[in-house]
Amino acid sequence: AALTPEYQTKVGSAGKAIPKGKIKIEDPNENGEGEVLIKTPTLMLGYYEDEEATKSVIEEINGERWFHSGDIGYLDKDGFLYITGRSKNVIVTQNGKNIYPEEIELLLSHVPEIKECMVYGKEDEKDKSNKELIVSVKVIPNFEKIGKDLTDEQIREIIWPKIKEVNKKLTSYKAIKNLEIKHDEFEKTTTMKIKRYAEIKKNK
């Protein structure tokens, strides 16, 4: 979606948008960085017979269809794109299988004890030799349902069995392996989507 014109190059840049294409940065931070969104005349309609996967990468904004690249980057004053990282939205297993967090989050949204959640890929802290990411979930509990003044351990004892029930509906490689209890709100974009890359950065 980007190319570098022969007459104008910039070191480190991925280039400008292709002709008739558009690039924009979703909800940029103080450094102008955010997820790179792409619009082109040849943008795919979606993934074959996989509506959830399609929704995870293509969004209609003001009547235009935009592709969520999963890349984090910024545009300079001349419209050149610089890639600075990945949003790590899709979790890729060592066998090359893709896990879409939105699919798992949809199932978790039906759990009354969970107010809000974010699924992401995380390094296994118990096994540093294992480089494969495990499926982890950050959960904001529904305190109106489970009660207040509970310790994290008590909250875990309530919510983990619910997660195990959700895991039964998933293929084994998509199963949630780690639960994190979150007490503050998620950082969100102007369209009220969770800033995944910002939340993941907090773990580092």
Q: What feature does the model see in each segment?
A:
Residues 1-11, 50-53:
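Active-site loops of AMP-binding adenylate-forming
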Residues 124-148, 168-181:
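Conserved loop-to-beta-strand segment in the C-terminal subdomain of adenylate-forming
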Residues 43, 80-109, 143-153, 170-176:
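Adenylate-forming
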Residues 30-93, 101:
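Conserved ATP-binding/catalytic segment of the ANL
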Residues 118-121, 160, 164-204:
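Conserved C-terminal "lid"/linker of ANL adenylate-forming enzymes
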Residues 1-5, 18-20, 99:
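Conserved A3 ("GATE") glycine/threonine-rich loop of ANL adenylate-forming enzymes
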Residues 26, 70-72, 110-141:
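C-terminal boundary motif of the adenylate-forming
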Residues 80-84, 89-90, 130-133, 196-203:
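AMP-dependent adenylate-forming
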